[in-house]
Amino acid sequence: LTDATAEKHDSFVGRGEMGSIIEIFSGEVLVQQEPDASSFPSGGIRNTFEARGYTAWDVSSPAFIVGNTLCIPTVFVSYTGEALDYKTPLLRSLAVLDKAAVDVCHLFDKDVKKVIATLGWEQEYFLIDEALYYARPDLMLADRTLMGHPSSKDQQLSDHYFGSIPDRVKAFMKEFEFEAYKLGIPVKTRHNEVAPNQFECAPVFEEANLAVDHNQLIMDVMRRVARKHKFRVLF
């Protein structure tokens, strides 16, 4: 529940005959695993043995490869079934929306079987030079400007909007877009935004659950690529 991606890595290592080590990956492991959730706040209402969390394969979102790691999108729920992530309530709401929309469609066409929600997100972000970032404790601690001049409002800097993209920023954009394409994220648009050092990227719209996964994933990619270009990215 950090508004960012989370991950748990498991190897394919298993025990073979006579104690030997083999690579194995079963369907049972793919469908559900039991990571520890005891470190999450519970208000003291749970015993430690009841503080388990379960990951379950989200088959509606495709797996992808990062480096040499196979990444499998999952939901994360508690021992008693409460959502410990934002994907679980999203999937539940999409299912409810599908059912309600199909009922409405049946008033006009009885052959409608399913309604798929799509989403076309756009990700705005600020790029801060690494040296300037480390000079600001508010940025380092909160990723927000908590002191200094008030932010620009009322479009005073509209000349920056849709203006020429600086070469250093363009190099960053090209690299993170290339990495995004390798992960199947269909990035289509990039441009300056209205505030100083503010920019935007946007993909082709997709099925809502997949679009949200891609949005979270591209922010993770942008953070990694920004460091290579001596930037820090703020969302």
Residue ranges and their predicted role:
Residues 12-235:
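Glycine-rich, acidic/polar active-site loops that bind/position phosphate-bearing ligands
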